[in-house]
Swiss-Prot record:
The organism of origin for this protein: Escherichia coli (strain ATCC 8739 / DSM 1576 / NBRC 3972 / NCIMB 8545 / WDCM 00012 / Crooks)
Record protein name field: Inosine/xanthosine triphosphatase
Binding site for substrate: T8, T9, N10, P11, A12, K13, E68, A69
Family matches, as SUPFAM superfamilies: ITPase-like (SSF52972)
InterPro entries referenced in this protein's UniProt entry, alphabetically: ITPase-like_fam (IPR029001), Non_canon_purine_NTPase (IPR002786), NTPase/PRRC1 (IPR026533), YjjX_NTPase (IPR050299)
Subunit structure as annotated in this protein's UniProt entry: Homodimer.
Binding site for Mg(2+): E38, E68
Entry-linked PANTHER family: NON-CANONICAL PURINE NTP PHOSPHATASE_PRRC1 DOMAIN-CONTAINING PROTEIN, PTHR34699
Pfam families reported for this sequence: NTPase_I-T (PF01931)
Source organism phylogeny: Bacteria, Pseudomonadati, Pseudomonadota, Gammaproteobacteria, Enterobacterales
GO MF term set: ITPase activity; metal ion binding; nucleotide binding; ribonucleoside triphosphate phosphatase activity
GO term, biological process aspect, one: thiamine metabolic process
Keywords associated with the record: Hydrolase, Magnesium, Manganese, Metal-binding, Nucleotide metabolism, Nucleotide-binding
Function (record text): Phosphatase that hydrolyzes non-canonical purine nucleotides such as XTP and ITP to their respective diphosphate derivatives. Probably excludes non-canonical purines from DNA/RNA precursor pool, thus preventing their incorporation into DNA/RNA and avoiding chromosomal lesions.
Length: 173
């Protein structure tokens, strides 16, 4: 059984990670543990590089905390231009897989508040009345009328980031 450490306590992220690992490695093949670790970047990262650095830092911190695991996974959401997106970073003892999620263009009224220094989650909670929206459907769920959720978009990126761990072509010389 694979021991998987999620570098998050966010239910939407944990759900995406659990579902993806079960789809790739088989139902019941993974034990998931979640830990709260620092990202080393601002609460609301801006740009692809800062956001990816946050995910990489979370993986490194989770590895230090639980070094006996088989996989460490982090999902870091950020703002790039006028859109929200995330980076997924997965590591095992010998390799790393990374994938960037789909992007969601944000309305100007939301972007204005985020650029003023507020994190997207609290801004969205205030506009929608949904407490802790970032731990639920997220801006993605709201702006896609529920057709996608934060977890569903993360799930796809986790599947992509897992590709090097189960596909032999990545191991070819």
């Amino acid at each position: 059984m694979h021991q998987v450490v999620c570098a998050t306590t966010n239910p939407a992220k944990i759900q995406a990670i659990l579902q993806a690992f079960h789809e790739i490695f088989g139902e019941g093949s993974c034990h998931i543990a979640s830990v709260a670790v620092e990202s080393g970047v601002p609460e609301q990262p801006f740009g692809s590089e800062e956001t990816r650095a946050g995910a990489r830092n979370r993986v490194a911190n989770a590895r230090r905390l639980l070094p006996e695991a088989d996989f460490w996974v982090a999902i870091e959401a950020g703002i790039d231009g006028d859109s929200t997106f995330s980076w997924v970073v997965i590591e095992n003892a010998s390799q790393r897989g990374e994938a960037r999620s789909a992007t969601l263009p944000l309305p100007a009224v939301i972007l204005e508040k985020v650029r003023e220094g507020e994190a997207l989650g609290p801004v969205m909670s205030r506009y929608t009345g949904i407490d802790e929206i970032g731990r639920k459907e997220g801006a993605i769920g709201v702006f896609t009328a529920g057709k996608l959720t934060r977890a569903s978009v993360y799930h796809q990126a986790v599947i992509l980031a897992l590709s090097p761990f189960h596909n032999a072509v990545y191991q070819a010389l």
